[in-house]
């Protein structure tokens, strides 16, 4: 068996990744209950002791445990189980598809898979040589190989399927005509068959060819006790149709001499009736017409009736026919005259050397011999015709690329009486053994020596001497001696036998031992004694001219097809003998097999009783020895599993090295040997696993080759996956690009509608109303439904449901605003409302809290047609009134920040275009029914927001009335979002170019400016008043401040000395290169900035931080900074003594006036990560003031009036600044 596929990679069987420093994600081990425990060793190369006995013991263990297959490297050893083990089901067959030898248990399916895969992969012809003795299971193995190949060879068209069916149909057909029950095997092949399956370049079967060898035609006329004739005779006589029985006179097998002589009619395990139907079905599948089938069974009937012709000795001593009716019926079947049949059987035509033709009457033995010769000739030629007819149907229907041959030939035979047939059979087995020796033992060792490979020679027996003993011409071998004896005394068979025996006795060969009446040949399988009597006559293998004349006189066209050659009465040249034919066939077979890559199946018969439980160790040991399994094990353990020329090796595996291939092309410029070495190097094959010869690369273990094959298969898979991935990415780019274009188009189109609506707002105001800055922003769009009333979900949908707004009403505008409520006895005030406008009505919706629950209800629903006018002012305020003029209700006075947008939608929805907008200095509305009132609008710069009081609205000045909206601002530049993700498509869009706005694939955050060191920071001038004011903890009124005792202000303190630079307790590092973080926990760095390392990991990442934040950064980007030595502590001059209050005794004072100078600050600052001390607690009796220094003693002092005045001034300045900011913010408001 050659090399098969590597296993497919398991997608789930990948190493578990773990986080840095985390616990590895190791799966818990599970006990596999499905795996079958191995008995013995499945490969005999693994046995501890190499001996015939150890091999036999291992085979016995496996046989007892229903394991019949064992490997010797790539050779399969099969032990016949004599029972069905259920190991040839479709499920088992599927499990071997695409698997190599090491993945699955030994099986004949693995041999078939290997042969089929190697044929497709290496484009080499393959052959499977099945050897072993009769009954060891060769035919069954051949059928299983055909079953597997037919299943996996693919092809869905009708022609290929028909070819498969015909190939499988040849098994039952040829078994019926070529197999028989023997003492050693119930289904013994009595012929040899070499089936050559032909495949096209795609590995699909397109045809087949069958060559048959050594049909045992003597079985037609004679069998030993308890054996049977060929199966077809019993199938036909038991299962023939009534038409055949009437036309051909078919009776039960017991009625015919040829089927009843051995006394065995039935066989255990064989159903002749069922197999007869299988034979008929096989004939139909192969394409035999009904007429052809009729002629086949007519010839079978003729053979059966020929055997029933009996003779007796006449008065003249010659043979006469006992029953003329039998001859008459045979003449009817052969379509000849009965007289011609009697003449052909009872009259012998002799042709001496002088050319005179002599007709000699035959005696009874001679007549019976001629009768049997007639039957054998018909059956032999009928079998050849069937094989030729099958080949005609299996002719290749397309161009043939490669083939797989399956050799099924009966095995080595040793009987008590061995004659010419056994000599031919054993000779062919010797030739097959010679092939095995040459290919696995001799040729392998010779190749190692020729290629200069380091090798330990193994001793083995070369059976060439035995083959030469049988087939040699000079000196003459056994076949040549037979032919010479026939030439010397061709007319007398007994004289020929004696001449042949004399020649055998004169031979000198260690493997030949002459005896009295027989001779012994020491075959590789054992010593066999051959009987000389009749052996030369069988070697003649020529049909009497009388029988040939009989066939020539037949009026049946089919008989002329069986015997196409006309009889040449003048030809005296000796025809080829049977020995010549078998030698030519055997040599042709050897030539065919040597042109293919062989796979071997060595079959072993465990016992002679066909028992499924018996294991005869003695018999099996004998088979182990003559099959040479021990030598095969030794060579396999010491040899190389694979060898190939450098050119073919590189051609096969150059894809595996980046130095020999690029994009599938061969780019290596050196010689093929260095290329092969480069491939093995790049694939990490250990040097111990291969050797380089003179012309070939040798790989020791099959696992290595499996790995190379698997990597090659994965290469194509990966390339296909890469192309698919790029193609999918390309399609995704097109889809995304189209989506982006559509999105931008819709955005521009929809935005254009909103912008056009905004321009209509300018037209409605007629350039007479001042505008707010927000209303003129370029990004301002009139969206309309701000509350989402038209949405199906969200708060807007709940409002719609609460007011029972019909679904048919389209919401044009919605927002929140306020309404001016007038209550009796109270001033008017603003109340929040919800404004909703549809195509027909304007709704004012209220929200009330009732029993702690919000209730939403329609307060007013004003039809748009009822609105007579809308009144607004010329100022920038948001107030407007809806002039309804209802006699029962007042007009609503509303405020809404989106008033202009509301007017725009209202004008478009107003029926008849009757929208009347009044713009004046005041707002007009009916405060009470039919009672109009004017609301004045005045400009007040002190008002940040619109303020209503006493029928007057105070508002700030706005933008000029003729102001127009600013242009739409450009969007903020953002990084281009990649269309796809993955290694093959670069980020940044279809072009794959990174965006100018990105660093990597995300924007780099702006660096926060790092504060300058304290030592280099300039000290600002200190305000005398502000310098004495710490954090304000309480606002002190001016009156209370003025009531305090006056204290002169202290002199300004001297500027403090620059503090030393803080020394970090954590290591500082400088950033060498700019780094953009790729995830949330990665920290983006700017080149040159200083960071602090908080945590170091061994995986190349450190946890860093600075003023901008913290995160993980690569170690290689950082360089440690050596901190400088701390500067000397500088002392500042003492301030002059402060005049004024006497020394106070107490501990809570802010300063001690009697102390001449404050102590110097500490040399080291607190750590950067430490939080500052909390401010002092507020005091009830005044403001707490801290001096510039700190001391152990403290005092309490009352602020002076000048100090209070300075504090008040500072507070006013601060309040003014805050108001200015608030004013600016209010201006930005709606």
Swiss-Prot record:
Keyword annotations from UniProtKB, A to Z: Actin-binding, ATP-binding, Cytoplasm, Cytoskeleton, Hydrolase, Motor protein, Myosin, Nucleotide-binding, Repeat, SH3 domain
Domain SH3: 1064-1123
GO CC field: actin cortical patch; actin cytoskeleton; cell cortex of cell tip; cell tip; cytoplasm; mating projection tip; medial cortex; myosin I complex
Protein residues bound to ATP: 132-139
Highest rank taxon of the organism: Eukaryota
PROSITE patterns (alphabetical): MYOSIN_MOTOR, SH3, TH1
Biological processes annotated in GO: actin cortical patch assembly; actin cortical patch localization; actin filament organization; endocytosis; mitotic cytokinesis
Any GO molecular function: microfilament motor activity
Transmembrane segments: none
Compartment(s) where it occurs, according to its Swiss-Prot or TrEMBL record: Cytoplasm, Cytoskeleton, Actin patch
Biased composition (Polar residues): 1033-1045
Region spans: Disordered: 1-32, 945-1018, 1033-1065, 1116-1230
SMART domains: MYSc, SH3
TH1 domain location: 771-961
Sequence segments annotated as region (Actin-binding): 403-485
Domain Myosin motor: 39-713
Role summary: Type-I myosin implicated in the organization of the actin cytoskeleton. Required for proper actin cytoskeleton polarization. At the cell cortex, assembles in patch-like structures together with proteins from the actin-polymerizing machinery and promotes actin assembly. Functions as actin nucleation-promoting factor (NPF) for the Arp2/3 complex.
Domain free text: The myosin motor domain displays actin-stimulated ATPase activity and generates a mechanochemical force.
Family: Belongs to the TRAFAC class myosin-kinesin ATPase superfamily. Myosin family.
Name this polypeptide is given: Myosin-1
Organism field: Sclerotinia sclerotiorum (strain ATCC 18683 / 1980 / Ss-1) (White mold)
Organism lineage string: Eukaryota, Fungi, Dikarya, Ascomycota, Pezizomycotina
